[in-house]
């Protein structure tokens, strides 16, 4: 039998802040730009460390519908390409700034950004 216990309060953070995990899909050539804007906006901070992020390559597909202005592919076609998923943590004090920075720097017309509230 596996018993689950709540971890100590200071295991993940020293301050009493709500934390989020942000995950964003980006083209291969944009990873450095997005990492930079996230860090400058206050994301990826864990204790005395900044720029704490991970990313991995995935294969993605989509079909651009009429009215779209796709970064890659053409309207009415299904596009398949390699891209990165980048993820990091951000506290509630910086969440709005980080999301705005990603949207401003991201080359996609409709950036895919997932925000998940983490358990404290």
Regions found by a protein language model. Give the residues of each.
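Hydrophobic structural segments
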Residues: 1-120
